[in-house]
Amino acid sequence: MLENRFHVKRSNFFDVLVVGGGHAGIESALIAQKLNKKVALITQDQSAVGRMSCNPSIGGLAKGQIVRELDVLGGSMAFFADKTGIQFKVLNKKKGRAVWSPRAQVDKRKYERAATQKVLGGGIKIVLGEAVSLKTEKYRVSGVILRDGSVVNSKAVILTCGTFLNGLIHIGQRKSQAGRMGEAPSEGITESLAALGFKTGRLKTGTPPRLNKDSINWSKTKKEPGDINPVPFSYFTQ
């Protein structure tokens, strides 16, 4: 399927251009493809499409319902979770059904592969590069400009950059520029949005510290097994 991957050296035109290959980017690209649109997904690293960060889980309190809503609306996250899950558990079972929340711990590498295969199998073009600016014509977005100066034209642009826009990582007292640990941030899109009159801000997400397993008294811990009869996320999972 590698014919779907290419380095842009000339102008290309798409109906929908998605910037970023995380959960939101994958869903956006696949839904647009289902609507028979010509779709391209821009990412700095094809192997990072669908990459899960520090906590490889899907769903949980409040979030599990959203995953199922995505499934009903034609999304793919629920299918990926069911296919790659290693532990399934419905939370809040001691309370009313309205607050029951499905959660799955998944194999993060298998999830990446499943997501990438789905994107490539759908005929979506993977554009390797870093989007640094929005291209506009007559007060409408008409594409993006990449770091190497290439232009990708489209009728619509969907930004799903996650934590990468001018991303910073704080570890103790140290601060460094990164979109994710070990990955470069995306610089330029934020400034492009600001130049178009959008207000920008900064959100924060936290990662809990890791413990050395040899420093833990395991006799004080309690196992939390998954459900004996796992409940899938997708209504289409048999």
Name each model feature, range by range:
Residues H23-E27, E112-R113, V141-L146:
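Short alpha-helical segments and helix-capping/turn motifs at coil-helix boundaries
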Residues F14, R147-A156:
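Core beta-strand elements of the Rossmann-like FAD/NAD(P) dinucleotide-binding domain
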Residues F13, L30-S133, A156, T160-R180, ...:
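Conserved N-terminal/central alpha/beta ligand/cofactor-binding core
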Residues F13-A24:
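Beta1/beta-strand and adjacent pyrophosphate-binding region of the FAD-binding site
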Residues K135-V151:
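Conserved beta-strand-loop-beta-strand element in the redox core of flavoprotein oxidoreductases
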Residues M1-F13:
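Intrinsic disorder/low-complexity segments
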Residues V19, L146, L159-T160:
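Redox-cofactor binding/interface segments in oxidoreductases and associated redox assembly factors
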Residues V18, E27-A32:
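Conserved catalytic-core segments centered on acid/base and nucleophilic motifs
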